[in-house]
Amino acid sequence: LADTQEIRILPMREEDYDAVRALWMTIRGFGIRALDDSREDVVRFIRRNPTTSVVAEADGRIIGSILCGSDGRQGALYHVCVAREYRRRGIGTRMVGYCMEQLRQMGINKVSLIAFSNNDAGNAFWRQIGWKSSDVNYYEFVLNEDNITRFIGDENEDQ
């Protein structure tokens, strides 16, 4: 495995979609939405937020990613992940730092994210780097019923 110094943190580009999606598909418990996570929607997101999303690259391969954007008032992180074999080496922290700096430069003062309550590793990571969970109710309203969420690793559990 590449040394941490050999891991590059780079802005996510539209051309990274296939490699980023392939990474998402390896993350057990990852929630992939049929429409929001399609090539078309991720490209639209990157075009709206051209400097804020990030990938981590080792030996020419994408091994981490974060979709990061802002509505002009608050920043948001989505789909934060690092390939299992590269975890616990500071890569996630470096990627989050990159995103936070980009948001700071845009004048954004607050950033949020959603971590599933059963995502023990993810929740431990966020606490470790100083994030606080909020006691808020999260509501969503589905505008398009085709935008179903599939959780990676759960495909065969119903059979």
Regions found by a protein language model. Name each.
Residues 69-78, 87, 132-135:
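A conserved beta-turn-beta hairpin within the catalytic core of GNAT-like acetyltransferases
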Residues 103-115:
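Conserved GNAT acetyl-CoA-binding A-motif
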